[in-house]
Amino acid sequence: RIEMRLSGTPLQYITGVQEFMGLMFRVNPDVLIPRLDTEVLVDQAIGILKAKEWENPFILDMCTGSGAIGVTMAHEFPDAEVTMTDVSPKALSTAMGNAQINDVFTRCIFLQGDMFEAIPEQKRFDMILSNPPYIESDVIETLSTEVKDHEPRLALDGGADGFLCTNE
């Protein structure tokens, strides 16, 4: 393990866990490590839904990765139905496991596909959340070794301008 850490492997991949908004998530090299920046997004989303007093919101988490966003929303809103999508089957499997260990699996739907491709056309949501790949391709090599050499490129690379997902 010391050798792994010295080679730049993130501590979270070595231990296999990362805390996110008070919940524990299993992480592996198939998913990004949940970060504090994403907690800001989730905290804002929680505030919006609570202010609107939605009792059973339908929430979509696109590019779910570890499931940190969707699982946290399901945990925060016990009557919510949360749909999580990811293009990576390995990431989706990790999200499923995290939904199970955080006791929200039965209220979550998992769909594999790229962005909205996985969503049935008639499905509607009260809130859509996403932390898609947004780093410009040319910038990735300037990131820390922990990120550029160990986190999944699929989850980082947002194309030439960082907006590949939103431009499509």
What residues fall within each predicted segment?
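Conserved SAM/SAH cofactor-binding pocket of Class I
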Residues: V40-T142
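A general structural signal for well-ordered alpha-helical segments in protein cores
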Residues: G8-L11, S66, G70, R153, ...
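Proline-centered helix-kink/hinge sites
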Residues: P10, P34, P132-P133, P152
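Cytosolic-biased juxtamembrane loops and peripheral soluble domains of multi-pass membrane proteins
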Residues: V17, G22, V87-K90, R107, ...
